[in-house]
Amino acid sequence: MRTSQYLLSTLKETPADAEVISHQLMLRAGMIRKLASGLYTWLPTGVRVLKKVENIVREEMNNAGAIEVSMPVVQPADLWQESGRWEQYGPELLRFVDRGERPFVLGPTHEEVITDLIRNELSSYKQLPLNFYQIQTKFRDEVRPRFGVMRSREFLMKDAYSFHTSQESLQETYDAMYAAYSKIFSRIGLDFRAVQADTGSIGGSASHEFQVLAQSGEDDVVFSDTSDYAANIELAEAIAPKEPRAAATQEMTLVDTPNAKTIAELVEQFNLPIEKTVKTLLVKAVEGSSFPLVALLVRGDHELNEVKAEKLPQVASPLTFATEEEIRAVVKAGPGSLGPVNMPIPVVIDRTVAAMSDFAAGANIDGKHYFGINWDRDVATPEVADIRNVVAGDPSPDGQGTLLIKRGIEVGHIFQLGTKYSEALKASVQGEDGRNQILTMGCYGIGVTRVVAAAIEQNYDERGIVWPDAIAPFQVAILPMNMHKSFRVQELAEKLYSELRAQGIEVLLDDRKERPGVMFADMELIGIPHTIVLGDRNLDNDDIEYKYRRNGEKQLIKTGDIVEYLVKQIKG
């Protein structure tokens, strides 16, 4: 490819609305352009990277025995109503009607469509197991699209769906997909971790996320410092303290705290250790409960884990925090003065709170707290559950080592769905015993566009992108200095361009009438791994300057050796 016949579209300045480095560099390197909120046009350089990610994904899915299909982006609403997700999915599901007033959705995922296909196409257990995948555009009407293609409304996704007649068969495919995903992300060159995860709105039993480690990540990923344990913070179990609860040393005292409406203010004004405070959060109770709200208690320096809390049988799903008006209607006090003593609604406390003594909490009276609260003496110990986020230094749930926490970008997710969708859509086959058998399902997703952004978050420097070799838009850049004035430079540039292309190497020849500084800056911004510079001065000694983008090292190589050298560097 020649730059004179290519849309390079690089930018010198960083766009003001680009928050994370991948968004900034994708705009500056001419990979994407914003069309509307959460919608991006992919330019030639971006498409080249995207296609390389797609190809790696496709190769490994095929190697794992999956079969490629293509399903419509537009899906009829009746399938979503049949599965129950029409009501469950919420406003991220973009709904519309056609000219015949028939309701449809823009697909954020394709469980319903593939299950509908299979229930009409398969009839016998002998046809199973099967695993289908597609690489296709999805749409989710994000409330706040941000970070460029990291959280956009329209994106490219590889989604796969497997069908089985037994849990053992599902486990085999699940393990094969786990291995395929590991190969995909390793081939791309990402530093990633596979972690246990919550199944979320997709549903099902077992689930793993594939997280690319990066400071800009939206997820907290938890690891043991000793074992292979890894989990999303939503799922990581907070182990109960091993030490028995300390004996009470204080009497419970009612204290005026008119200016302490938060834990931080309480700690600062009364010089309390934050570990001796408890915060109380009120959430909506499950429909049909005799109480409208449920009180959830965590230690003052801990955070409520909303995923764990939502799984409590007495808590409404989705988890909804009570408004001040709702709180006052039940407790007769505001949110800053809540606690377990005389709480008129059901209470669930975290395991760590259950082990506390002599602690401070709201008195359920505005502007007052109780200090020196002790369980069973001042208030009966309520239901105890794991409802907090783990913190760094907590013991690992597998009993080996302590926990570390890093930020991660989710690029892949695999689920064991079980029979959630097949039961709802009545997808079954004749089993080996001749009876009708509901199918067991798995689903497996990779955010292809997100992989591109995640790769940049791990691979950049002050000059631009430093692509992993496997997904770089071009493998070699040829920079001929003053080629329009030097016939020797022009002739050699054309010769090397032809020879490298003949070897199957992707080359970008910069034949623009530009200053050398602009040419160097653009190639480094785009992140092409191998650059060769042709100039009259070096050619006087039969030399070509070679530079490797990742480490910035330069060396002079003889003109007769440069093609062989590059082929060896790229192909091994």
From Swiss-Prot:
<keyword id="KW-0030">Aminoacyl-tRNA synthetase</keyword>
<dbReference type="GO" id="GO:0005829">
    <property type="term" value="C:cytosol"/>
</dbReference>
<protein>
    <recommendedName>
        <fullName>Proline--tRNA ligase</fullName>
        <ecNumber>6.1.1.15</ecNumber>
    </recommendedName>
</protein>
<dbReference type="GO" id="GO:0005524">
    <property type="term" value="F:ATP binding"/>
</dbReference>
<comment type="function">
    <text>Catalyzes the attachment of proline to tRNA(Pro) in a two-step reaction: proline is first activated by ATP to form Pro-AMP and then transferred to the acceptor end of tRNA(Pro). As ProRS can inadvertently accommodate and process non-cognate amino acids such as alanine and cysteine, to avoid such errors it has two additional distinct editing activities against alanine. One activity is designated as 'pretransfer' editing and involves the tRNA(Pro)-independent hydrolysis of activated Ala-AMP.</text>
</comment>
<keyword id="KW-0436">Ligase</keyword>
<dbReference type="InterPro" id="IPR007214">
    <property type="entry name" value="YbaK/aa-tRNA-synth-assoc-dom"/>
</dbReference>
<dbReference type="InterPro" id="IPR002316">
    <property type="entry name" value="Pro-tRNA-ligase_IIa"/>
</dbReference>
<dbReference type="GO" id="GO:0006433">
    <property type="term" value="P:prolyl-tRNA aminoacylation"/>
</dbReference>
<dbReference type="InterPro" id="IPR050062">
    <property type="entry name" value="Pro-tRNA_synthetase"/>
</dbReference>
<dbReference type="InterPro" id="IPR004500">
    <property type="entry name" value="Pro-tRNA-synth_IIa_bac-type"/>
</dbReference>
<dbReference type="InterPro" id="IPR033730">
    <property type="entry name" value="ProRS_core_prok"/>
</dbReference>
<dbReference type="InterPro" id="IPR044140">
    <property type="entry name" value="ProRS_anticodon_short"/>
</dbReference>
<dbReference type="Pfam" id="PF00587">
    <property type="entry name" value="tRNA-synt_2b"/>
</dbReference>
<dbReference type="Pfam" id="PF04073">
    <property type="entry name" value="tRNA_edit"/>
</dbReference>
<keyword id="KW-0547">Nucleotide-binding</keyword>
<dbReference type="GO" id="GO:0002161">
    <property type="term" value="F:aminoacyl-tRNA deacylase activity"/>
</dbReference>
<dbReference type="InterPro" id="IPR036621">
    <property type="entry name" value="Anticodon-bd_dom_sf"/>
</dbReference>
<dbReference type="InterPro" id="IPR045864">
    <property type="entry name" value="aa-tRNA-synth_II/BPL/LPL"/>
</dbReference>
<keyword id="KW-0963">Cytoplasm</keyword>
<dbReference type="InterPro" id="IPR004154">
    <property type="entry name" value="Anticodon-bd"/>
</dbReference>
<dbReference type="InterPro" id="IPR023717">
    <property type="entry name" value="Pro-tRNA-Synthase_IIa_type1"/>
</dbReference>
<dbReference type="GO" id="GO:0004827">
    <property type="term" value="F:proline-tRNA ligase activity"/>
</dbReference>
<comment type="subunit">
    <text>Homodimer.</text>
</comment>
<dbReference type="InterPro" id="IPR006195">
    <property type="entry name" value="aa-tRNA-synth_II"/>
</dbReference>
<dbReference type="Pfam" id="PF03129">
    <property type="entry name" value="HGTP_anticodon"/>
</dbReference>
<keyword id="KW-0067">ATP-binding</keyword>
<dbReference type="InterPro" id="IPR002314">
    <property type="entry name" value="aa-tRNA-synt_IIb"/>
</dbReference>
<keyword id="KW-0648">Protein biosynthesis</keyword>
<dbReference type="InterPro" id="IPR036754">
    <property type="entry name" value="YbaK/aa-tRNA-synt-asso_dom_sf"/>
</dbReference>
<comment type="similarity">
    <text>Belongs to the class-II aminoacyl-tRNA synthetase family. ProS type 1 subfamily.</text>
</comment>
